[in-house]
């Protein structure tokens, strides 16, 4: 399946028929894959797959996004582009994030779950408090 075919398939699940072209166009432009957008995904590098996946997830306006380290994708120019779009989505949506970037977590999160050694789970109303617990737990 090519990048375009994948985007078309997913778009059929999450958008109206008259929005299909706009979704495909958004992902094609945003991901900056060029000719690779029409090539099989199995030929993509991990970075290309991440760009396609991030662009595809951002093509839809959801109430909640599940985010796993995706903001670290690509070169500096692409990261800035992701950050601008992320900020836009953050104004109208919520994020459930997994990240090793403390700055990203502090920027986008209002509360935190910290899963420590032995799978101990703790909820924190303060992201800063969760980060301190993480650092303490990791000996940082």
Named regions from a protein language model:
Residues 37, 60-61, 90-92, 108:
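Short loop/turn elements that form and flank the Walker-type P-loop nucleotide-binding site
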Residues 118-140:
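Conserved beta-strand-loop-alpha-helix hinge in the C-terminal portion
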Residues 101-107:
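Conserved H-loop
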Residues 1-52, 56-76, 84:
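ABC-family P-loop ATPase nucleotide-binding domains
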Residues 107-114:
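Conserved catalytic segment of ABC-fold P-loop ATPases
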Residues 85-97:
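Conserved catalytic loops of ABC-family nucleotide-binding domains
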């Amino acid at each position: 399946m090519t990048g375009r075919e994948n985007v078309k398939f997913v778009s059929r699940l999450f958008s109206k028929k008259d929005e299909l072209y706009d979704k495909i166009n958004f992902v094609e432009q945003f991901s900056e894959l060029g000719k690779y957008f029409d090539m099989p995904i199995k030929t993509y590098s991990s970075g290309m797959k991440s760009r396609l996946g991030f662009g595809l997830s951002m093509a839809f306006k959801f109430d909640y996004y599940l985010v796993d380290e995706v903001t670290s994708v690509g070169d500096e120019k692409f990261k800035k582009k992701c950050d601008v779009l992320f900020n836009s989505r953050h104004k109208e949506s919520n994020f459930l994030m997994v990240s090793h970037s403390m700055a990203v977590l502090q920027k986008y999160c209002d509360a935190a779950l910290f899963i420590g050694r032995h799978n101990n789970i703790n909820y924190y109303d303060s992201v800063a408090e969760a980060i301190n617990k993480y650092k303490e737990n990791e000996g940082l």
